[in-house]
């Protein structure tokens, strides 16, 4: 079944480029940039990937991102991810990047963007993988900081298609970012947001009504609110669900408890994605395979999930 799932044409709509930084590349970039790491080798770092919640993961994620310093580093990171896409027949990807993770430690915005954008361009020309880049604001920082990031991004507006919202969800509701999202929309950007991963269904309502998002990233807690479920079904609002991430971060204790297939059968436009694959133990095919192994996903369900991902693209073919 793995090979069949791997060959299925699919899109990936929820992937953080910084979260695809594999330990081997992390060590190579640290050496290139002469950065001392707190881990002695790749295996020690892999063992550190045993987190219990979103915050523990984020602490490690930001520490790892510190090795990314030059445009070449960001190119190499993005290119390594695109090669994985090619291996897994991901024909279109809409990755997130978190400029604030880098600008806050002194890496200029254009250094980050130039490396990523040139890799995505080469990915289309050399690998045939189309893409649309999403700039994501960090929700644990202030809206004022997000506004500054949007200011930095506007001269490069052609390089990305949408803005998003990620990082620590609890205590940082979408309403905190209403004005910057209003402004981004007025500048012509589409909008998406992480909501309903650890946060309550109310955060999904806010993301829809206040941020006016086109797509919900995660959204698994919508299942707790029947009125919200009905709206998502009626309006066919896509959810970019990340099964391995959800179990690794204890949103669900075990994959057998995941609600993605129940949502699919209810008529929700759910999609399968890898989120931060270097940290969560798998890329898109591994996520599909886990649904087959632990939830008994059928080939018909896999086809529908893959088609949903192609239908839910912000960048239409």
UniProtKB/Swiss-Prot annotation:
The active site is at 197 (proton donor). Signal peptide: none annotated. The keyword GTP-binding does not apply. Zn(2+) binds at residues 14, 16, 194, 275. GO terms for molecular function: adenine deaminase activity; zinc ion binding. It is an enzyme of class 3 (hydrolase). GO terms for biological process: adenine catabolic process; hypoxanthine salvage; nucleotide metabolic process. Substrate binds at residue 276. Binds 1 zinc ion per subunit. Its cofactor is Zn(2+). Its EC number is 3.5.4.2. It catalyses: adenine + H2O + H(+) = hypoxanthine + NH4(+). One of its GO terms (cellular component) is cytosol. Pfam families: A_deaminase. Transmembrane segments: none annotated. The record marks 218 as: Important for catalytic activity. Keywords: Hydrolase, Metal-binding, Nucleotide metabolism, Zinc. HAMAP family: Adenine_deaminase. Belongs to the metallo-dependent hydrolases superfamily. Adenosine and AMP deaminases family. Adenine deaminase type 2 subfamily. PANTHER family: ADENINE DEAMINASE. Catalyzes the hydrolytic deamination of adenine to hypoxanthine. Plays an important role in the purine salvage pathway and in nitrogen catabolism. This is Adenine deaminase. It comes from Pseudomonas fluorescens (strain ATCC BAA-477 / NRRL B-23932 / Pf-5).
């Amino acid at each position: 079944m793995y090979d069949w799932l791997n060959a299925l044409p699919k899109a990936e709509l929820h992937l953080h480029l910084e979260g695809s930084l594999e330990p081997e590349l992390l060590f190579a970039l640290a050496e290139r940039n002469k950065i001392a790491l707190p881990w002695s080798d790749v295996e020690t770092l892999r063992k550190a990937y045993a987190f219990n919640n979103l915050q523990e993961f984020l602490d490690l994620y930001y520490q790892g991102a510190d090795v990314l310093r030059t445009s070449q580093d960001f190119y190499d990171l993005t290119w390594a991810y695109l090669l994985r896409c090619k291996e897994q027949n991901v024909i279109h990807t809409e990755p997130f990047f978190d400029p604030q993770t880098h600008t806050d430690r002194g890496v200029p915005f254009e250094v980050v963007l130039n490396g990523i954008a040139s890799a995505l361009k080469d990915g289309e020309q050399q690998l045939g993988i189309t893409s649309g880049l999403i700039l994501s604001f960090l929700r644990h920082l202030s809206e004022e900081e997000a506004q500054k990031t949007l200011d930095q991004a506007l001269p490069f507006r052609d390089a990305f298609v949408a803005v998003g919202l990620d990082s620590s969800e609890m205590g940082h509701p979408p309403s905190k970012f209403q004005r910057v999202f209003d402004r981004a929309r007025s500048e012509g950007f589409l909008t998406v947001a992480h909501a309903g991963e650890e946060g309550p269904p109310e955060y999904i309502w806010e993301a829809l009504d206040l941020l006016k998002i086109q797509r919900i990233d995660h959204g698994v807690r919508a299942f707790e609110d029947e009125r919200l479920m009905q709206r998502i079904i009626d309006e066919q609002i896509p959810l970019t669900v990340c099964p391995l991430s959800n179990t690794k971060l204890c949103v669900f204790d075990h994959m057998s408890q995941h609600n993605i297939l129940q949502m699919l059968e209810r008529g929700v436009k759910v999609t399968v994605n890898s989120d931060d694959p270097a940290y969560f133990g798998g890329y898109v095919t591994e996520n599909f395979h886990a649904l087959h192994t632990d939830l008994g996903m059928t080939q018909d369900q896999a086809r529908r999930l893959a088609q949903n991902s192609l239908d839910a693209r912000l960048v239409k073919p």
